[in-house]
Swiss-Prot record:
Residues 22-33 are annotated as: Kinase inhibitory region (KIR). Interacts with multiple activated proteins of the tyrosine kinase signaling pathway including IGF1 receptor, insulin receptor and JAK2. Binding to JAK2 is mediated through the KIR and SH2 domains to a phosphorylated tyrosine residue within the JAK2 JH1 domain. Binds specific activated tyrosine residues of the leptin, EPO, IL12, GSCF and gp130 receptors. Interaction with CSNK1E stabilize SOCS3 protein. Component of the probable ECS(SOCS3) E3 ubiquitin-protein ligase complex which contains CUL5, RNF7/RBX2, Elongin BC complex and SOCS3. Interacts with CUL5, RNF7, ELOB and ELOC. SOCS family proteins form part of a classical negative feedback system that regulates cytokine signal transduction. SOCS3 is involved in negative regulation of cytokines that signal through the JAK/STAT pathway. Inhibits cytokine signal transduction by binding to tyrosine kinase receptors including IL6ST/gp130, LIF, erythropoietin, insulin, IL12, GCSF and leptin receptors. Binding to JAK2 inhibits its kinase activity and regulates IL6 signaling. Suppresses fetal liver erythropoiesis. Regulates onset and maintenance of allergic responses mediated by T-helper type 2 cells. Residues 141-160 are annotated as: Disordered. The gene is Socs3. One of its GO terms (biological process) is response to estradiol. GO terms for molecular function: cytokine receptor binding; miRNA binding; phosphotyrosine residue binding; protein tyrosine kinase inhibitor activity. Pathway: Protein modification; protein ubiquitination. Keywords: Growth regulation, Phosphoprotein, SH2 domain, Signal transduction inhibitor, Ubl conjugation pathway. Residues 46-142 form the SH2 domain. This is Suppressor of cytokine signaling 3. It comes from the Eukaryota.
Length: 225
């Protein structure tokens, strides 16, 4: 078993401090998975590192529903937490890391497979609505920390199935909507350009046609958000 420390603050490029982290890694591969996730999160601009749940609530409470951030989890069993402002206040969803992938904590009674990803950014992007998708509106409900997927009921323009995810509590539900990350720092022009390019590279062939240095730069952060 390998134990490592809390991650450095967002936007900082120094190596990980390996003295204080309480969460235990199950393997070297899991350690590397998390290190890569932290590196990309630090470049994302919406990783708030060691802010607490209360601090996340204060940050998000003045923002519109759908605003979110990623922070270190205060639960020693998890590395990261997704904090999102909803129509019933701020919700904190634990991001599980197991089996070489990340996933949102889900209802254990659900029979549907939980979407899993090798990167926290890919997980966040999965739960963001595609362009042109409608916003969901439901009455407020009690806080909850579990997510379920509702199968697609109709298709978006272009034939893409529309999937909705809900946070459940006491038999009620509120929509999980991730529409805008809350920035923790000012992004560089290079990073903004990289996100734009990532959002328009819809095939591997397009990537291979780019010059080597540009491909390497894109590989370091391969998400459009």
């Amino acid at each position: 078993m390998v134990t490592h420390s809390k991650f450095p603050a967002a936007g900082m490029s120094r190596p990980l401090d390996t003295s204080l982290r309480l969460k235990t890694f199950s393997s070297k591969s899991e350690y590397q998975l998390v290190v890569n996730a932290v590196r990309k999160l630090q470049e994302s601009g919406f990783y708030w590192s060691a802010v607490t749940g209360g601090e996340a609530n204060l940050l998000l409470s003045a923002e519109p529903a759908g605003t979110f951030l990623i922070r270190d989890s205060s639960d020693q069993r998890h590395f990261f937490t997704l904090s999102v402002e909803t129509q019933s206040g701020t919700k904190n969803l634990r991001i599980q890391c197991e089996g070489g992938s990340f996933s949102l904590q889900s209802d254990p009674r659900s029979t549907q497979p939980v979407p899993r990803f090798d990167c926290v950014l890919k997980l966040v992007h999965h739960y963001m609505p595609p362009p042109g998708a409608p916003s969901f509106s439901l009455p407020p409900t009690e806080p909850s920390f579990e997510v379920q997927e509702q199968p697609p009921a109709q298709a978006l323009p272009g034939g893409t199935p529309k999937r909705a995810y809900y946070i459940y509590s006491g038999g009620e539900k509120i929509p999980l909507v991730l529409s805008r990350p809350l920035s923790s720092n000012v992004a560089t022009l290079q990073h903004l350009c990289r996100k734009t390019v990532n959002g328009h590279l819809d095939s591997y062939e397009k990537v291979t046609q780019l010059p080597g240095p540009i491909r390497e730069f894109l590989d370091q952060y391969d998400a459009p958000l």
